């Protein structure tokens, strides 16, 4: 699920956490970035 990483992955305010990117990749996406403390899959 595209939004499942939002709750699971904590983010810093700027840039992305590796945790977010890994979660998104496991979900089948290319990766993820963090915006406003939330993980977004891309």
From Swiss-Prot:
Gene3D superfamilies: Knottin, scorpion toxin-like
Gene Ontology MF terms in the entry: potassium channel inhibitor activity; toxin activity
Keyword Secreted tagged: yes
PROSITE patterns listed in its UniProt record: ERGTX
Gene Ontology CC: extracellular region
Domain of life: Eukaryota
Keywords of this entry: Disulfide bond, Ion channel impairing toxin, Knottin, Neurotoxin, Potassium channel impairing toxin, Secreted, Toxin, Voltage-gated potassium channel impairing toxin
Localization annotation: Secreted
Domain remark text: The presence of a 'disulfide through disulfide knot' structurally defines this protein as a knottin.
Protein name: Potassium channel toxin gamma-KTx 1.7
Biological classification of the source: Eukaryota, Metazoa, Ecdysozoa, Arthropoda, Chelicerata
């Amino acid at each position: 699920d595209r939004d499942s990483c939002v709750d699971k992955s904590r983010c810093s305010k700027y840039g992305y956490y590796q945790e977010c990117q890994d979660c998104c990749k496991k979900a089948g996406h290319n990766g993820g970035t963090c915006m406003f403390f939330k993980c977004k899959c891309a």
